[in-house]
Amino acid sequence: MKIGVISDTHLNLYDDRLEQIVADHFESADIIFHAGDIVDLAVLDVFKGKQIYAVSGNMDPDSIRAVFPQKRVVEIEGWKIGLIHGWGSPPGLEDKILREFEDVACIVYGHTHRAMNEVKDGVLLFNPGSPTDRRFARHNSVGILNIGREIRGTIVPLD
């Protein structure tokens, strides 16, 4: 199973560049995870009928918060995956989000705009970075999770 992972799009409308990113990197994805800061529901139209699991982020308006929770757990092929945006300053964020979930193999998160693909305390912490905003990162990026006998994450740099 291939999951396209994206976060922190921060777009107010449908975007041609995002459409190209999705075509290039998520065409073969079975599922999409969006880890928040969507900003406008129309942005999700770019995923063209793929199953989307998303959470709201700190920059999302009430229209997004009414549709998507702040955190959730998704079970895929027997693996429990936590999905959360994140909050506050980046130092210590991973420790905070680890405390938000029990019995998960992976936590997908955003907020920092900086990609991460590391195991901590036996949990894969996976942040795809941001495809559109690199104020806090050297590169724009998205991510791919491959799920089978294990969960493997790949960060895909976009520039």
State each model region's role.
Residues 71-72, 115, 143:
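Residue-level detector of beta-strand structural context in well-folded domains
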Residues 59, 66-83, 91-100:
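Glycine/small-residue-rich loop that forms an oxyanion/phosphate-binding "nest" at active or ligand-binding sites
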Residues 10-14, 39-42, 59-65, 88-93, ...:
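Active-site environment of divalent metal-dependent phosphoester hydrolases
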Residues 50-52, 122-123:
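A short helix->loop->beta-strand "cap" motif at the edges of active sites that frequently abuts
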Residues 1-45, 49-50, 60-70, 78, ...:
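N-terminal active-site segment of His-dependent metallophosphoesterases
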Residues 5-7, 31-37, 53-58, 83-85, ...:
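Active-site neighborhood of phospho(di)ester-bond hydrolases with catalytic His/Asp-centered motifs
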Residues 13-25, 83-84, 88-101:
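Pre-active-site segment of Zn-dependent metallo-hydrolases
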Residues 6, 76-77, 99-103, 120, ...:
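Binuclear metal-dependent phosphoesterase catalytic core
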